[in-house]
């Protein structure tokens, strides 16, 4: 098991679904890099630095996981990190078509980069960062969907936005 894998995403914020996939990827690969995309087109609620910090806190117990922010093409980031595998999550069949297109594009751009798809545990299959933010924005309790530190950070971020 000498493979370096990248699990890329925006992680705005990291959810229990993300954490579940990270834990399982950490068992499959020698080294897992969580690549947090700057992705300004998504207009994230948390800054890149805040997202890196939150993911670091959630994954602190995993010795073979490293969290790195990046911008630009994912395949270029993978080359910089000497990773040969991309880990992607599939929550539902609806995710498959988009992920299939991404995998094929990434293969064209970097033929040696292999995409591996993991499905979340059933209890996490419906969770998305967008839904978590929506629930939190309307005053709902998100504690069952995110790590306690993420719930606190989200509450603080939303309270600042309201002020």
UniProtKB/Swiss-Prot annotation:
Listed InterPro entries: Cyt_trans-like, PPAT, Rossmann-like_a/b/a_fold
State the SUPFAM superfamilies in the record. Answer: Nucleotidylyl transferase
What does the record give as EC number?
2.7.7.3
Site (Transition state stabilizer) location in chain = 18
Q: Say yes or no: keyword Metal-binding present.
A: no
Question: Which pathway is it part of?
Answer: Cofactor biosynthesis; coenzyme A biosynthesis; CoA from (R)-pantothenate: step 4/5
Per UniProt, which keywords does this protein have? ATP-binding, Coenzyme A biosynthesis, Cytoplasm, Magnesium, Nucleotide-binding, Nucleotidyltransferase, Transferase
Cellular component annotations (GO), alphabetically ordered: cytoplasm
Instruction: Give the family, as the similarity comment puts it.
Output: Belongs to the bacterial CoaD family.
NCBIfam families in the cross-refs:
coaD_prev_kdtB, cyt_tran_rel
Task: Report quaternary structure and partners.
Answer: Homohexamer.
Protein name as annotated: Phosphopantetheine adenylyltransferase
Native organism is Shewanella sp. (strain MR-4)
Q: Which gene encodes it?
A: coaD
């Amino acid at each position: 098991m000498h493979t370096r894998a990248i699990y890329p995403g925006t992680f705005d914020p990291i959810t229990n679904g993300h954490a579940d996939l990270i834990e399982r990827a950490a068992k499959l690969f020698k080294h897992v890099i969580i690549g947090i995309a700057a992705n300004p087109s998504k207009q994230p609620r948390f800054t890149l630095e805040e997202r890196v910090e939150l993911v670091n806190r959630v994954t602190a117990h995993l010795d073979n996981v490293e969290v790195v922010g990046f911008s630009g093409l994912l395949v270029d980031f993978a080359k910089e990190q000497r990773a040969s595998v991309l880990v992607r999550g599939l929550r539902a069949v609806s995710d498959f078509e988009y992920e299939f297109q991404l995998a094929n594009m990434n293969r064209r751009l970097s033929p040696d980069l292999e995409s591996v798809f993991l499905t979340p545990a059933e209890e996490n299959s419906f969770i998305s960062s967008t839904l978590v933010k929506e629930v939190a924005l309307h005053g709902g309790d998100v504690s069952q969907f995110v790590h306690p530190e993420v719930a606190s950070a989200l509450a603080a971020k939303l309270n600042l936005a309201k002020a």
